[in-house]
Amino acid sequence: MVVMTIIAIMAGAVYPSVASSLDGIRLTSSADDVVAFLNGAVERANRRQVAVELTVDPTAGTFVVHSTEAEFERHFELPQNIAIQAILPELVGGAADPKQVRRFYIYPGGTVPRVGVLLAGKNGAQRLVRVDPITGAPKIERRQGAVQ
């Protein structure tokens, strides 16, 4: 009986840190998936020499890529516990609804738009997935606190 009590106390003390670690792993994994999706959109535009439209819907937590090629469409949906907190750059004036659908266009051989998506987990951790307009490569930044 004493052993069961000790195990119960230890499980109660360890559970929050394990749950927090799992949330962090889910957030990192989701950020990696978004990077791969964005990289695929940039590569498609450059390799196929077609314009690509990237649509980000923060309310639904989805990313959609359309191309000028017939019947090409790719979807990516974030897991339930990961949310899109902000889409960068903010619109001019900053008065727009932060939950509105945003569209970015990627042209072959052109400059990649400076797209940034701030992902947030339940525990408050954040990852900023940003496309570098010079190299066209997406990268992940760890964030704490407000959008800068």
Language-model features: where?
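N-terminal signal-anchor/signal peptide hydrophobic helix marking the start
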Residues: 1-5
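N-terminal helix-rich module
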Residues: 9, 13-36, 43, 47, ...
